């Protein structure tokens, strides 16, 4: 097996994104064209590769100076437990070290301890809200 490599890129095929997102059960994988366009419009995207296979990524949305929202940290199930998610987080946090705020909204409570290891804490009176328009 080849060593895992990491790239800062926003260029993915629709099929690469579809496979990755559906592998972790995320419904947004059913919208690969929108995912591809969304990645291009993101602030920072760091991806993990096994050879030419996309196996993980983390995406940040930001205003360039004050706040970044980390969105989409996902790793193929067969590659989980190999510290790939940790490496992706370390790399994106380094890219955003100058920001005043870095925020994340974990969608699964079981992942909260993972983010706490990087210094994230529950945000006081904040409540995550969503308007889901997937059909």
Label the model's feature ranges.
Residues 1-30, 126:
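Short amphipathic alpha-helix that is part of the acyltransferase structural core
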Residues 12, 65, 109-110:
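Short alpha-helical
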Residues 36-47, 101:
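A short helix-loop-beta-strand connector motif used in the catalytic cores of GNAT acetyltransferases and
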Residues 79-88:
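Conserved acetyl-CoA pyrophosphate-binding loop and the N-cap/start of the following alpha-helix
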Residues 87-102:
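Conserved acyl-CoA
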């Amino acid at each position: 097996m080849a060593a895992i490599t990491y790239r800062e890129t926003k260029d993915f095929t629709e099929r690469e994104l579809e496979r990755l997102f559906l592998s972790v059960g995320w419904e947004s994988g059913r919208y690969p064209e929108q995912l591809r366009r969304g990645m291009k419009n993101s602030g920072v995207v760091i991806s993990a590769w096994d050879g030419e296979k996309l196996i993980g990524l983390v995406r940040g949305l930001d205003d360039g100076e004050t706040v970044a929202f980390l969105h989409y940290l996902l790793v193929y199930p067969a590659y989980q437990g190999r510290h790939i998610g940790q490496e992706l987080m370390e790399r994106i946090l380094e890219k955003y070290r100058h920001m005043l705020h870095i925020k994340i909204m974990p969608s699964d409570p079981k992942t909260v301890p993972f983010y706490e290891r990087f210094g994230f804490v529950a945000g006081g009176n904040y409540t995550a809200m969503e308007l889901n328009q997937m059909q």
